[in-house]
């Protein structure tokens, strides 16, 4: 019952009902543990096109799904959490769950924990190698 699945129930059901699909799910509950602090991130973003893009995105993106943190002092790194989990599976734990009762009954893998410290460290190391 997460907002990503509620935004596109047809796509979610399609994936859940696809036989033999190796389906790995990074939940909002799990990836919320990988958050960047605004002050720290802004200090570390470079004065280049990527740095400007990231700062602008942070400042101007409207978080329509929540009213928590109106100053946007923290940012959950949704996409980075799944990318890091794929690249470094040792930094993530997956458990097997059954699909919901209304869907094709099969096992899917759900990320239940991530090593957010290692993921942050890896991001900044790679970011700092750019340019």
Question: What are the language-model segments listed below?
Answer:
Residues 1-131:
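N-terminal acidic, glycine/proline-rich low-complexity segments
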């Amino acid at each position: 019952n997460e907002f990503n699945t509620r935004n596109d129930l047809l796509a979610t059901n399609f994936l859940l009902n696809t036989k033999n699909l190796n389906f790995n799910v990074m939940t909002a509950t799990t990836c919320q543990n990988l958050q960047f602090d605004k002050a720290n991130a802004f200090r570390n973003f470079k004065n280049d096109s990527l740095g400007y893009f990231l700062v602008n995105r942070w400042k101007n993106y409207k978080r329509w799904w929540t009213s928590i943190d109106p100053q946007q002092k923290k940012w959950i790194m949704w996409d980075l959490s799944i990318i890091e989990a794929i690249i470094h599976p040792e930094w993530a734990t997956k458990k097997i769950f059954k699909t919901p009762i209304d869907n094709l009954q099969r096992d899917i893998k759900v990320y239940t924990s991530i090593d957010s410290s290692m993921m942050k460290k890896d991001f900044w190391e790679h970011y700092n190698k750019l340019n």
